[in-house]
Amino acid sequence: MRTHYCGQINAELAGQEVTLCGWVNKRRDLGGLIFIDLRDREGLLQVVFDPDQKALFETANSLRQEFCVRLSGKVNRRPESQVNKNMATGEVELLATDLEIFSRSEPLPIDFNQQVSEEARLRYRYLDLRRPQMNEKLQFRAKVTSAVRRFFDDNGFLDIETPMLTRATPEGARDYLVPSRTHKGRFFALPQSPQLFKQLLMMSGFDRYYQIVKCFRDEDLRADRQPEFTQIDIETSFMSAEQVMEITEQMARDLFKQLLDVDLGEFPSMTWHEAMRRFGSDKPDLRNPLELVDVADVLKDVEFKVFSGPANDEEGRVAAIRLPGQAENVSRKMIDEYTQFVGIYGAKGLAWIKVNDRSAGREGLQSPVLKFLPDEVIEPLLERMQAETGDVLFFGSDKSHVVAEALGALRLKLGKDFELVSNEWKPLWVVDFPMFEVADDGSLAALHHPFTAPVNVTPEELKANPAAAISNAYDMVLNGVELGGGSVRIHENAMQQAVFEVLGIEKDEAQEKFGFLLEALKYGTPPHAGLAFGLDRLVMLMVGASSIRDVIAFPKTTTAACVLTDAPGAANPAALQELGVKSIVKEDE
């Protein structure tokens, strides 16, 4: 139907006849001529219609925005005065000789020249995706997946599919359940990840596996979450954690170099404890220069219980952030707003000190908490914070996890508000995570998943002191975004049983849910390790989008609905009866 894409037309084709297909992006009449900008996935091209060709000109006169057409004509150089340097094809235009209208368009229900709500964009997604900026994002995504496949194919990995219909596993979120018609009363679950199947593939001898795979989680949504998302899934046998990190880091470096011409360099490594201590986050944005500094030892003997209480509590922490040179710009109103902000993360308040004159000691400071601080702690505190004239110090004092979350979030907000974040790429590995975390009910939960191997402990030692166990896990972080997470897996039956026991999973329950895995672990399981990247999140970061919905063709809303197709919808009663399922929700609920 066509010989070229619009975006391929350039001065080298001047004088040639070409045929193009696409949509009318814009139409204008000027000096007795009709001009249109023809658009396809590769770009725009100006087309001109000569009034001397009466039949063609009459047809062109009926063209309106978003008509879908085929055009043939001769490529001409534009006069120098008419060259449009804002268009990639701005040196040339097409003098039309033939026009076929494939289909006409009614007036568009949305005007993309104005601010359009996200719901409207999703409702008319097929129109939204015609916009060049959306088209470019999805084309970029396609380039990412192609580059990923090439990399793993070239490195001896096998692309193997795993089941979409499986059984529920405890991976931290609710499952999407699929009722079985042939096994009434029983349900499949859509996979939250291919975790267990890829481990079984290692046990089957496929020592290098990868898959670009859909995963499903029924959870509350945020800007970087979707109920269905795409994962770059990797698993290897006979490779150490360091080797897995090395090959996946190389993949990331190659990807950024090929597609963005960005050299990420070697990734530094940081322990989880260091990340939480310095940045209040296990996915720190290293572009932000602000850090959390511990000051509990300086303030542990003051009479002010807000500081001394947590400073003398084994589970407490007192830390501060130094905001350099902004004392004059930080108003009391801003401090009140920051106090409310940290309250979202559980902080009971936000103490602060302005350093108006570092050389004047106490007299050069401004703060409502100064009256509670004796002279002997002032200088050590300022030295610890490396405070200088014009700085503002913000304090967090509470349980360690509250201080980390509150000051970690404040660090990011201060970095954004005062434009401290550099415009560069800052990758790192976060390693040595705790094996377990304390759940809301006081029980232990796996920080990653229950198939992650601990570092250098026996099953007996793990059960005796699970809180001290370190997992052999690693997360790849870039600019504050977790690109991927992985770990060395448990490959011994006794250790897997021990982890289940620590997690409070009884033997009968473990057998019911994971009997196939425990059985497989009896028959010569190789040491294995892997990692999974969130493809949507990776592309979002690379193209600079604010939400993964901008890099998914047909995403769901924040309520996990598709406004385009009006899904989820009510099921046919006959289909429910055949499945042995009864709806207890009324139609209007």
Swiss-Prot record:
Any one GO cellular component localisation term in the record: cytoplasm
SUPFAM superfamilies to which the protein is assigned, alphabetical: Class II aaRS and biotin synthetases (SSF55681), GAD domain-like (SSF55261), Nucleic acid-binding proteins (SSF50249)
Keyword Oxidoreductase: no
Region (Aspartate): 195-198
Places the protein is found: Cytoplasm
CDD domains in the cross-refs: AspRS_core (cd00777), EcAspRS_like_N (cd04317)
BP terms from Gene Ontology: aspartyl-tRNA aminoacylation
Residues that, per the record, bind L-aspartate: E171, R217, H448, R489
UniProt enzyme class: ligase
GO molecular function terms noted in the UniProt entry: aspartate-tRNA ligase activity; ATP binding; nucleic acid binding
UniProt-annotated binding residues for ATP: R217, D218, E219, Q226, E482, G534, L535, D536, R537
UniProt keywords, alphabetically: Aminoacyl-tRNA synthetase, ATP-binding, Cytoplasm, Ligase, Nucleotide-binding, Protein biosynthesis
Pfam families: GAD (PF02938), tRNA-synt_2 (PF00152), tRNA_anti-codon (PF01336)
Catalytic activity: tRNA(Asp) + L-aspartate + ATP = L-aspartyl-tRNA(Asp) + AMP + diphosphate
Top-rank taxon: Bacteria
Gene3D superfamilies: Bira Bifunctional Protein, Domain 2, GAD-like domain, Nucleic acid-binding proteins
EC identifiers of the protein: 6.1.1.12
Known function: Catalyzes the attachment of L-aspartate to tRNA(Asp) in a two-step reaction: L-aspartate is first activated by ATP to form Asp-AMP and then transferred to the acceptor end of tRNA(Asp).
PANTHER family, per the entry: ASPARTATE--TRNA LIGASE, MITOCHONDRIAL, ASPARTYL/LYSYL-TRNA SYNTHETASE
Oligomer status and interactors: Homodimer.
Similarity comment: family membership: Belongs to the class-II aminoacyl-tRNA synthetase family. Type 1 subfamily.
Protein's recorded name: Aspartate--tRNA ligase
Organism expressing this protein natively: Idiomarina loihiensis (strain ATCC BAA-735 / DSM 15497 / L2-TR)
Lineage: Bacteria, Pseudomonadati, Pseudomonadota, Gammaproteobacteria, Alteromonadales
